[in-house]
Amino acid sequence: MALDSAFERAPCQSAVVYGLMPSENENNTPYLLRLAQQGAALAQVLLLDEAHAWTDLPSRTAQTGWLNLVQDVPHWLSLDELQGGQNLRSQSQMSLPICRENGAVLGVLQLEYAGKNGFDEAAQIVWLGLALALAAPLQALLQPEKAEEAQDE
């Protein structure tokens, strides 16, 4: 419901909540799994490795724990700060980490907008608020033992 509400207040082309999952593959690479979405569908699974950090903004955000705001995707592509033709599906992207209180990344909120400069200050506030609000439920979903420890403190 919170994703629906934020999407109504700050509409965009795509809004996706990814959960950070432990590695379940032979090369021990953790990945992001799409848990919820509004608007156009984005990738179901994104690996967290060096190659994907350049091609998928949510992977970069999950690896660094930093918010990434790209108001002009073609410009970032021309600078090689972002790579891959799939990024041309939008002109603006914002990728926000969803973190525990200690800064550990639980997931990523990925947003895409059809036009350049798609995320004004009001939209950034709405989406940042959602990223903060998602921390507790995402921790309970993905790390239930740590959520119980936090409640006991």
Where are the predicted features?
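A short, aliphatic-rich beta-strand micro-motif
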Residues: 92-100
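Regulatory sensory and allosteric helical modules in signal-transduction proteins
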Residues: 19-83
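Intrinsically disordered, low-complexity terminal regulatory regions
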Residues: 1-40, 140-153
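Broad gene-expression machinery/nucleic-acid interaction feature
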Residues: 14, 93, 108
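Residue-level marker of regulatory loop/turn positions in helix-turn-helix DNA-binding domains and
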Residues: 50, 87, 119
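Short loop/turn motifs at secondary-structure junctions and domain boundaries
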Residues: 84-91
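Juxtadomain coupling helices with adjacent low-complexity linkers
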Residues: 107-153
